[in-house]
Amino acid sequence: MEQVQAGNPGAFTALFERHRAPLYGFVLRMTREEASAEDCFQDTFLSVHRARQTWSRAAGTFRSWLFRIAANAVHDHQRRSSRRPLVLTEEELPLPVRDWPEERLMLERALAQLPPHLREAFLLGAMHGLDHSELAEALDISPDNARARLSRARTQLRQLLGGS
């Protein structure tokens, strides 16, 4: 990000490529539909580009800042649009998803049943590897609250998946 701020012409493209897959995965799991995910993904990188001079290392990691912008884009999108049901039928799943192993489909369905604030914490912490302090920065909550949300999300997922 510092290269982007310094005006390096290829730096934003490199930054985009580095974070594209995990960020798109996050917004897709939060929105549960490709069109909404693409909108949120584009909004995120547009916001990053517009706010590129406001990020500083002192404020936290770039990754937590990026995911915070993405989470805000998802929240804004959800407020603006009417929501589809979170649990999709087999026919509504995109074709590649239909080929997933049954365990993966079960996890995706269980994630869809979590309250949005717990799903967001689980996706960022457990699936995208943000540590508790990064998770707290990304969600704009305290580290203790981040740890608690992640724990509650894991507990609820275990219950939804039939574990103890």
Predicted regions and their residues:
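DNA-recognition helix of helix-turn-helix
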Residues: H75, L118, M127, L139-S164
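Amphipathic alpha-helical segment used for protein-protein interaction
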Residues: A6-P9, S82, P94-L124, H128-A138, ...
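Short, charged helix-capping/linker segments at alpha-helix termini
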Residues: Q5-A14, Y24-D43, R57, G163-S164
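Structural recognition of an alpha-helix C-terminal capping motif at a helix-to-coil junction
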Residues: G25, D39-L46, G60-N72
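Hydrophobic positions on the alpha-helical face of helix-turn-helix-like DNA-binding modules
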Residues: T44, I69, F122, L135-A136, ...
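Arg/Lys-rich amphipathic alpha helix in sigma70-family domain 2
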Residues: R50-R57, F67-L88, W100
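Amphipathic, Lys/Arg- and hydrophobic-enriched alpha-helical face
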Residues: F16-E34, A51, F67, L111
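Short amphipathic helical patch at the helix-1/turn junction of helix-turn-helix
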Residues: F16-E17, L28, G125-M127, H132, ...
